[in-house]
């Protein structure tokens, strides 16, 4: 097998939340505090600065970019060159928010670190749902560092990685964006 790799971007600090849209790889470089894009020719562009570390990225049905702001636990909207608050998730979790996936109706599902950076034992945390109008609620609880979330192509299942549990957990996703029928989808290791 002959594989050819081409470096398309360097001098990045910690790239996170990759998404492919409009022929470009969109990502957060959270130690640079910026959302960036890279195309296949190696053209890298800073889209917007996010002072409190960007992470998960997604788009609302109208095309507006939404960005998880990690340190202040907010979901920001970037439209017409302006960054505004879409939702404040700080009352739902005291921990840094991170990865996100957005369904076809504009419901965003945002994970968070849990207690890992507070010098305490790891404790389960929540998955937050933010609807397209910016209303936030808890979608699921008792997750061990929810991260790496996807929605299946048919839009009927949400699968989330539980980093510290070594498993993928699946939920059924209804047309209103509610989760049900929680189950283990795969296990990568046991403790």
What are these regions (language model features)?
Residues 190-191:
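Conserved small/polar residues in nucleotide/adenosyl-binding loops
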Residues 11, 25-31, 65-72, 108-121, ...:
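Conserved beta-strand positions in repeat-built beta-propeller and related beta-rich domains
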Residues 14, 53, 96, 123, ...:
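Beta-rich catalytic cores
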Residues 34-36, 74-76, 126-128, 167-169:
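A short loop-to-beta-strand structural motif that recurs across blades of beta-propeller domains
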Residues 82-104, 113-115:
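Asp-box/WD-like beta-propeller blade repeats and closely related beta-sheet repeat scaffolds
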Residues 171-177:
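Short loop/turn segments immediately following beta-strands, especially the blade-tip
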Residues 20-22, 60-62, 102-105, 153-154:
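Residue-level detector of Asp-centered blade-edge/turn motifs that repeat once per structural unit
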């Amino acid at each position: 097998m002959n594989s050819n790799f081409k470096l398309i971007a360097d001098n990045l600090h910690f790239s996170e939340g990759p998404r492919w849209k409009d022929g470009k790889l969109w990502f957060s470089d959270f130690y640079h505090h910026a959302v960036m894009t890279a195309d296949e020719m190696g053209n890298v562009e800073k889209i917007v600065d996010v002072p409190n570390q960007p992470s998960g990225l997604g788009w609302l049905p109208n095309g507006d970019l939404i960005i998880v702001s990690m340190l202040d636990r907010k979901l920001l909207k970037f439209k017409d060159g302006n960054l505004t608050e879409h939702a404040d998730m700080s009352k739902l979790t005291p921990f840094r928010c991170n990865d996100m996936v957005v369904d076809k109706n504009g419901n965003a599902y945002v994970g968070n670190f849990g207690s890992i950076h507070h010098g305490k034992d790891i404790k389960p945390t929540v998955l937050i749902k933010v609807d397209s109008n910016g209303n936030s609620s808890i979608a699921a609880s008792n997750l061990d560092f929810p991260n790496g979330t996807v929605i299946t192509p048919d839009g009927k299942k949400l699968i989330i990685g539980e980093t510290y549990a070594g498993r993928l957990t699946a939920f059924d996703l209804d047309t209103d964006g509610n989760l049900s029928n929680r189950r283990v989808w795969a296990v990568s290791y046991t403790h």
